[in-house]
Amino acid sequence: MRRILVTNDDGIYAPGLRAAVRSVEDLGEVIAVAPSGQRSGVGRSVSVFEPLRMAEVNLDGKKAYAVSGTPTDSVILGIFVVMNGELPDLAVSGINVGENISTDTVTTSGTIGAAIEAASYGVPAIAASIQVADQGDKFDNNHSVEYKFDTAMNLLRRVASRVLERGMPVGVDILNINLPLNATEDTEIVVTRLARKIFKTAVEERRDPRGRPYYWIGGDLICSEREGTDVRAVYQEGKISVTPLTIDSTAKVDFGEIMDLLEVI
């Protein structure tokens, strides 16, 4: 039987994780291993300075595992402890509450970080996310609205089934799926590339009661981007974005140009 590892960065009890499990549970044996709490924005960080604990939990009547660390930690423990070092046939990360579009989020998202970790072992990975109505909902499980996962579940199941049957296209490690707010079964699906930015980075300085400064990193959304990008598809066109990702970050350039650059050093 095929085995599917499911994880996320919103925590083991997040409704999106439950939705992801339900979406693929008829495709094989599902092993759900996820952080014990909210760990958004931690990227692919690994806990190397503290021990990890893992607890068996009940998730809708089925066994799952809560990990004290990051999404990447969860993938590692899922593969090397729960699965005894045997690789799953597919890894699913999500369904995340909060769109993971542009290089800004792909390089900082715990959802994507978990998918990258799975892909590093040769496991095909799918990351699925839905757009939020309020950016604060990305970091707080007490959401401003009730998010519906039906469309995301149906799409995730179809994509997962196809990947299990055919494998990933050559050169693709991860499929990053992002659904706009209020997507339906009729919403158009487009294949996109990553936009460069999603936030206009800003730093807000505040003062504590003793007058010492502290800082919040934030910034306004960039909702207008070039044609063919994930940001444009989701924000401007209201389409479902599917971005093929590779974990090989090597720039696709003529190495001779780099040698020419180095010759002057």
Swiss-Prot record:
EC number: 3.1.3.5
Pfam family, one: SurE
Superkingdom: Archaea
UniProt entry tagged with the keyword Flavoprotein: no
Catalyzed reactions per annotation: a ribonucleoside 5'-phosphate + H2O = a ribonucleoside + phosphate
Residues holding a divalent metal cation: 9-10, 40, 96
Top EC class, one word: hydrolase
Cofactor(s), names only, from the UniProt record: a divalent metal cation
GO terms assigned for molecular function: 5'-nucleotidase activity; metal ion binding; nucleotide binding
Keyword entries, A-Z: Cytoplasm, Hydrolase, Metal-binding, Nucleotide-binding
InterPro entries, per database record: SurE, SurE-like_Pase/nucleotidase, SurE-like_sf
Subcellular location: Cytoplasm
Gene Ontology CC terms, in alphabetical order: cytoplasm
Cofactor note: Binds 1 divalent metal cation per subunit.
Family named by the database record: Belongs to the SurE nucleotidase family.
UniProt function note: Nucleotidase that shows phosphatase activity on nucleoside 5'-monophosphates.
Name the record gives this protein: 5'-nucleotidase SurE
Organism: Methanothrix thermoacetophila (strain DSM 6194 / JCM 14653 / NBRC 101360 / PT) (Methanosaeta thermophila)
Organism lineage: Archaea, Methanobacteriati, Methanobacteriota, Stenosarchaea group, Methanomicrobia
Gene from which this protein is expressed: surE
